[in-house]
């Protein structure tokens, strides 16, 4: 399996190189040169498998030709999911006759990011050991990616990891899950700015060729294709449980950076009959506006009770745009560069309508989100975190008639105690292993929204660990 850049000016790569590079040299995102497709019989053969084995079989086609054989991958997925809190790893819960919640929060940091990142951390170890190399991972987080990435990479011998988070713009639980990790190879940076500022600085570090080479930069944000590959299996597992490939399904996902719903779309590229992809947004509604009216204009980031979606620039949308443009890399590059410069994405009506055929969207403000949390609990007894509640509302608003819809539950409600208390008057408890989270000492450094300042911090950190 080889990968190409969405912007067309970088050489094609095999999976191992894509894993370690994260972002293509031309600023584009890697995508498979051709999509692997399973036959209906091959999909049916995966029904009923333990999740770790299903995950390995779904991911395997993306990793051919490198250091990771199938037996290696299966050992990695088994180790990755052994510590999850639920035997099914990703259980389905039925809320309504045709509405099913896919719980993705049973991992070590209580968020869907664990499912891909626990695998990615071990993939890094495997490939770097085979090459006798070391990398510095830099990433930006709006809340959940940071803690999941740190948990996946802490104390690994060949990886240093530096994570930027927007100071004061995550929940306290999200912040503490990052900053209370004490490991020599972990650096937490609290940035004065928004998530988009953090993400821009990460992209700028990758664009700084001497810095990128000096520190051997890599990424575990969803710009890294390994993250997307690690998220496809749970949508496949849910679809198979509901009758696919012999029955169509729909998927609803609370969406910030567009990676999770892109993984569901990738599952369809692989042959699963997923009929509609439903985007749930908060007041930062750029994706919902685009889907409704071809209006993708950035605005100031609004702080909400669903902070993981407090994003204006959804990096993974570039991968879908590349496909919608018929894999026209120069046009993709032009569109993305213009979007970055002007704050407005301009696509033709034909391209917009091609996206609209598959995608729908709904945006909820904070009041509607809190009301939806209360409604879900009153009607079903289910306690959904703010992001999940938005996804459920989107599912109910836009699901195709007669088609079961899978709503992704992306985080445990205990990660957002203040919002949950406002909505339903309770603060859901953390699992026992996190009982002392509020008593643990925090470890982080503050930085201004300055590339030079952040690069200095990361360089000092990485070189200290090289010594």
Please annotate each region the language model reported:
Residues 1-467:
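PLP-dependent amino-acid enzyme catalytic core
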